[in-house]
Amino acid sequence: MGSDYVLSILVDKASGITVEDTAELTELISPLLDTISPDPFPDQYMLEVSSPGLERPLKTAESLKAAVGSYINVSLYRAIDKVKVFQGDLVAFDGDILTIDYLDKTRHKTVEIPYQAVAKARLAVKL
């Protein structure tokens, strides 16, 4: 009944992906895959169309530029002012410096982080 293979296609757009979007894309893509000859997937497989997720990684400068205005989590190679992880709104990114507005206890603060200092960055969910 189940298949051993999964063809996973990640889709995204600026306004975000809905469940309806993934269903429509699945209905468009599936028949197109069946028309390819020779069949690149001769064994049974499951087609999975999904979005990268709410807390997707931001691995490139381009993905960080696209995330300006979003709430993010950034881990650093070395601490800045004794802090190694920042979570807040990405206010700006010019390719070299990330500017993040974050909450330190009850006060808003802004930190400028060199892009080279970023070990990991991802979108985050604001609670």
Swiss-Prot record:
Entries under SUPFAM superfamilies matching the protein: YhbC-like, C-terminal domain, YhbC-like, N-terminal domain
Primary localization class, coarse: cytoplasm
Subcellular location: Cytoplasm
InterPro entries associated with the record: Ribosome_maturation_RimP, RimP_C, RimP_C_sf, RimP_N, RimP_N_sf
Keyword tags: Cytoplasm, Ribosome biogenesis
A single BP term in Gene Ontology: ribosomal small subunit assembly
Function field: Required for maturation of 30S ribosomal subunits.
HAMAP family named in the record: RimP
Protein name per its UniProtKB record: Ribosome maturation factor RimP
Source species: Streptococcus equi subsp. zooepidemicus (strain MGCS10565)
Source species taxonomy: Bacteria, Bacillati, Bacillota, Bacilli, Lactobacillales
